């Protein structure tokens, strides 16, 4: 959007505080300023109470909304984002995981799966070369099979595995 001279609002759930309060980062080190979803929604409910031709935010016309770590959204936040698409005709693109380390849907992911117009999977590959569909939590070289669904800032790590190697507990060759 930026390359095309358009303005995209970057958002993240308040749960995601790993990269600092007002920033999102990629695994390769790219960073961009972002706002918390709930703060944005409070502001727009005040700003956009009328149906205008252009919806402004920070003095700029909003062309799109991008949400990082969308799995951490609440179902209600997902519904509000769908209202932005339907009633304000602003595209909302959400990026995140489908399932947790136990292969259960996150509540935000579940709601996105239920109402999203389009779902595109970005394929990830297991160490064996097969499609990785399991976000595997591990600690001390062993797969973790119990614990809190959301674990930020812990000593545990995550690796993408195919379902077979997840079931077998094989983190690598």
Predicted regions and their residues:
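Sensor-1/coupling segment of RecA-like P-loop NTPase cores
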Residues: 85-108
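Conserved D-loop-proximal element of ABC-family nucleotide-binding domains
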Residues: 75-76
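Conserved AAA+ ATPase core "coupling" helix
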Residues: 123-143
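Short basic (Lys/Arg) and small-residue
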Residues: 116
